[in-house]
């Protein structure tokens, strides 16, 4: 039996691919990269916080550095921590070669300070908002929200965590030592080429972009070493479109303590926790027994799917390990029990308010038969007012509202699952969800709030609207 030159080259190429595939399987099976912890940037004594948007060199695989976008020299950007009651001055600087706008999702500030189209920064430009922090403790995230380019700008790396702290949260017996027992976890999926460079194809992302590599703080399959006891994970899903279902590989419980807009009234014990794009969660994990555990995000691609992924783009994740946690040493001095009461919330859920209908449409893209238009206000509300929104979708997708917070009344007529308890600003909608919305901050015709599909490609296509919230007297 003889081989032609073409057959020989094909066989040789396949052998190389299979070798690479088996290497990636081996590399992905054991976590050997320590979790990168973004630097902490805190507001102190009224000093401004500098946020520089720039190109950085980053090694997603730990070896080959590639040029991406980042903030203050890192990807993701530093974790910004502020205190409720402070007025925080930011100084954004755009050192990239195209216009960008930024926002902080979850931060309840007036429309003049939130960012967006009216605060677009040209290359070389600055923007210096002063943010009045007047809300309860919460895990938020700051990111690009450049109109019609939100998806590529977030994918390129313009993301970071934003923590609001208040006296009530500081007094609770919860892990709060940043990078020691309180960890920022930013999830993104990307598609990396052979040189470790992220690839993005907007035209192929007809239903949102899905990568094949799960990254946590810009790293694939990382680990952390911690003291025995309880740890806290602050989770942000910064992916363009992918929804995750997080669980422990050994079946242990995860204790949900906070949602998008802050702490729940009491912890919720769960075996798995869904996370839609844009959602934030805070969870506690008990490591007092000293047993290693891996947090996973579902099933990874099988061998044949991996093989196909060598020759054509795949939407399946090669590895779904989020984080391996390795407890060491003696018990932590932090409380050995989950507090039964976190915060008090006496909000009365009511359905007596006249509903407002919000319909997200895919074809043609828009909300209530209108494509996102920067010069148009789509709805008007009143600051501190309460509204009932009936949000419907043609295909399942997450939905986000700026400048407001809400509670989920029901999903498709059914009570929300425990994972959707508490105050939120982002929610996954299968068909129809009913929301009790509190309009916390004012916005204006030239500085409106935006509500949109949190599948970022959908928002860029025009599934978004703008609202003006008239100031209270």
From Swiss-Prot:
It is found in: Periplasm. Pfam families: Cu-oxidase_2, Cu-oxidase_3. Its main location: periplasm. Predicted to be exported by the Tat system. The position of the signal peptide cleavage has not been experimentally proven. Keywords: Cell cycle, Cell division, Periplasm, Signal. One of its GO terms (molecular function) is copper ion binding. Residues 1-27 form the signal peptide. PROSITE patterns: TAT (PS51318). InterPro entries: Cu-oxidase-like_N, Cu-oxidase_C, Cu-oxidase_fam, Cupredoxin, FtsP, TAT_signal, TAT_signal_bac_arc. GO terms for biological process: FtsZ-dependent cytokinesis. Cell division protein that is required for growth during stress conditions. May be involved in protecting or stabilizing the divisomal assembly under conditions of stress. Belongs to the FtsP family. This is Cell division protein FtsP. It comes from Proteus mirabilis (strain HI4320). The lineage of its organism: Bacteria, Pseudomonadati, Pseudomonadota, Gammaproteobacteria, Enterobacterales.
